[in-house]
Amino acid sequence: MIRSTLSSWREYLTPITHKSTFLTTGQITPEEFVQAGDYLCHMFPTWKWNEESSDISYRDFLPKNKQFLIIRKVPCDKRAEQCVEVEGPDVIMKGFAEDGDEDDVLEYIGSETEHVQSTPAGGTKDSSIDDIDELIQDMEIKEEDENDDTEEFNAKGGLAKDMAQERYYDLYIAYSTSYRVPKMYIVGFNSNGSPLSPEQMFEDISADYRTKTATIEKLPFYKNSVLSVSIHPCKHANVMKILLDKVRVVRQRRRKELQEEQELDGVGDWEDLQDDIDDSLRVDQYLIVFLKFITSVTPSIQHDYTMEGW
């Protein structure tokens, strides 16, 4: 809790900046956080902004109805140690630090654990994601016909075991003033709706991150004491900066290939018309990417659940 207290003081004392440095640092301003939150809620309506309430400790640099984002009752049907990673985070980050195939630019955020709903509809688990539109599609829920499987499962007496494993999480995304990036908080419940202890919530954090990234702390935006596990945001900006650079390289290469094709077809003015194109990831797409690399920290929480409500 000492670390949590120090973090709270740092958040309180760090001055707010409104100068955008997204493309150069991977950090965002409060205004850009709101912009990215609006986009997330538009694309995935189960994500909501907070409602105004007397229970909230407001920060005056954000609108009262846009202090934090929340999605409730996200399923978690197994523990993190039961998830087999396709690619370990160390391997993925090493790949980012080296000059490799630009086609794998978003493989970091697209890498998934073997999970009942982790594979996008119509996709394969090992397919690389190379565009933000495909990334958005990857977050959608795959429609499955579960009737036959459920009957067989019940016949084998597996339902009781499944209920013991079943958990749900409320996920919160707030703005970190000290790191100028989004910060994730998770609050867990068992199948009966009783709150999970911090130790139980840590079971759903990847072992690689439990002692490095996850912290027990109270939700800072509620006046009432609500215990959570937060995902420390110290590396978020660096990951986003690397990703931005990679996206830029991929899109520039594709544009060059398209230009060459157009020139072969006799379209000589194509290059002049494309000079003002922005090859970077848009700042409003920030949280889409943010949620994808959060899955490496909490692999058993079904983040793909965002396209369905309760």
From Swiss-Prot:
Mutagenesis or variant effect for C234S: Instead of the formation of an intermediate complex with a thiol ester bond between ATG3 (E2-like enzyme) and ATG8 (substrate), a stable complex with an O-ester bond is formed
Subcellular location: Cytoplasm; Mitochondrion
UniProt PTM comment: Acetylated by NuA4 complex acetyltransferase ESA1 at Lys-19 and Lys-48. Acetylation regulates autophagy by controlling ATG8 interaction and lipidation. Deacetylated by histone deacetylase RPD3.
Residues modified as N6-acetyllysine: K19, K48
Activity modulation: ATG12-ATG5 induces reorientation of the ATG3 structure, increasing conjugation activity of ATG3.
Induction of expression: Expression is increased during filamentous growth and controlled by the RSF2 transcription factor.
Miscellaneous field: Present with 3610 molecules/cell in log phase SD medium.
Record note on quaternary structure: Monomer. Interacts with ATG8 through an intermediate thioester bond between Cys-234 and the C-terminal Gly of ATG8. Also interacts with the 40 amino acid C-terminal region of the E1-like ATG7 enzyme. Also interacts with the ATG12-ATG5 conjugate.
Protein name: Autophagy-related protein 3
Organism: Saccharomyces cerevisiae (strain ATCC 204508 / S288c) (Baker's yeast)
